[in-house]
Swiss-Prot record:
The keyword 4Fe-4S does not apply. Residues 246-260, 340-349 have a biased composition (Basic and acidic residues). One of its GO terms (molecular function) is structural constituent of cuticle. This is Cuticle collagen 71. Its main location: membrane. Residues 223-280 form the Collagen-like domain. Residues 188-201, 223-240, 314-323 have a biased composition (Low complexity). Residues 174-186, 202-222 have a biased composition (Pro residues). Disruption phenotype: RNAi-mediated knockdown causes hypodermal or cuticular rupture, typically in the anterior body region. Dumpy body shape. Defects in cuticle integrity. The chain crosses the membrane at residues 38-60. It comes from Caenorhabditis elegans. It is found in: Membrane; Nucleus. Collagen polypeptide chains are complexed within the cuticle by disulfide bonds and other types of covalent cross-links.
Length: 371
């Protein structure tokens, strides 16, 4: 059976499926299994894409928040570390010890700022204390101006290395402490450091170490004036003032030069109508000379068509025409309903495969016969 175009034949299952009838192909378990697997694969793929579209923005937002929080904590940690190193450097330089020989120089572990004096008591004998620059983070602050803080029982005052003479120049009290920062998270435990070298044997005490109280600093003079600030924005426009008095009349000016000739004036209006002339005298008319022939006029427009004439008498019948070409084949009809199952066929012939063969030549079959 072919389609309307006659190009490709239709199979019976396809025609039945187009008609809405079930075939034995639809009841095939393999087809059902493949169809179920296809539906499941499409469903899982769609759910996976939807989950990815929903989860990706959430993960991106969480990563951004964690990154922002880590940056804030790192900045806070750097500020706290810098403050600790500043305080340690200030405390190391702010303890003046008495002239006692009961302290020996340490070999390692202390960073000495190049601009601060060597504390008394940290040198052994006549040897000067050497400047030690380690790889500790405190070495990063050597370029900053050094400020030593003296420690005593009273209020804290700032001191410098020139306090040995009892005077204080260009020193000011420190400003008020800033607001406390947010509490940081406890850091991990550091690794255990290496054991230090054995210290030198101590000397017998000669005199008790008493802190020397530095004299109070005089009030600092007023600083120089700062640079003038930037010019402010222009103010709003003021209200309009009152009208002023009329000025005095000026003197007459000099006579001007002769002006240029003006343009031509407009054409005057027509004059009044004159008086009526006298009537001519009656006389016989005299024909004038004949004029030249005029030009040929244009062709006139086409006239309207006349009324149609009456029909003539019918002519003799003509000869019959030739047979026309055959028309195209019509479309195939709707296929019929499949017929009923045929009658069961007769029983098949017995098989020729024996069940077993005896040694004496007999052949036995499953139905008990022997040949």
């Amino acid at each position: 059976m072919r389609n309307a175009g006659g190009d490709k034949p239709f199979s019976t299952p396809v025609l039945l499926r187009e008609m809405g009838l079930k075939t034995h192909v639809d009841d095939d378990p393999k087809t059902k299994a493949y169809r179920l697997i296809g539906y499941a694969a499409v469903t899982f793929s769609t759910v996976s894409v939807i989950c990815f579209c929903v989860t990706m923005p959430v993960v991106f937002t969480y990563v951004q928040s964690v990154k922002r929080q880590m940056s804030h904590e790192m900045a806070t940690c750097n500020v706290n570390a810098r403050q600790i190193f500043d305080d340690v450097a200030a405390l190391r330089a702010g303890f003046p010890f008495a002239q006692a020989g009961n302290r020996t120089a340490r070999q390692a572990g202390y960073d000495v700022h190049p601009s601060k004096p060597t504390p008394v008591g940290y040198s052994g004998g006549d040897a000067a204390a050497a400047e030690v620059k380690g790889n500790s983070p405190a070495a990063a602050y050597e370029d900053k101006p050094f400020v030593a803080v003296g420690v005593e029982e009273g209020p804290h005052t700032a001191t410098t290395g020139s306090d040995s003479e009892g005077t204080c120049h260009d020193c000011c009290l420190p400003g008020p402490p800033g607001p406390p920062g947010p509490p940081g998270r406890p850091g991990p435990n550091g690794k255990a450091g290496a054991n230090g070298l054995n210290g030198n044997p101590g000397r017998p005490p000669e005199a008790p170490c008493e802190p020397v109280t530095p004299p109070p600093c005089p009030p600092c003079p007023a600083g120089p004036k700062g640079a003038p600030g930037q010019a402010g924005y222009p103010g709003a426009d003021g209200q309009p003032g009152s009208q002023g008095d009329n000025g005095e009349k000026g003197s007459d000016g000099a006579a001007g030069e002769k002006g240029r000739p003006g343009p031509l004036g407009k054409i005057g209006e027509p004059g009044a109508t004159g008086e009526t002339g006298e009537n001519a005298e009656n006389s016989e008319p005299t024909p004038g000379p004949q004029g030249p022939p005029g030009a040929i006029g244009p062709v006139g427009s086409r006239g309207t068509p006349g009324h149609p004439g009456e029909d003539g008498e019918a002519g003799a019948p003509g000869a019959p025409g030739e047979n026309g070409t055959d028309g195209e084949n019509g479309e195939d009809g709707v296929p019929g309903v499949p017929g009923h199952d045929g009658k069961a066929g007769r029983a098949g012939e017995r098989g020729i495969c024996p069940k077993y063969c005896a040694k004496d030549g007999g052949i036995f079959f499953e139905d008990g016969t022997r040949r």
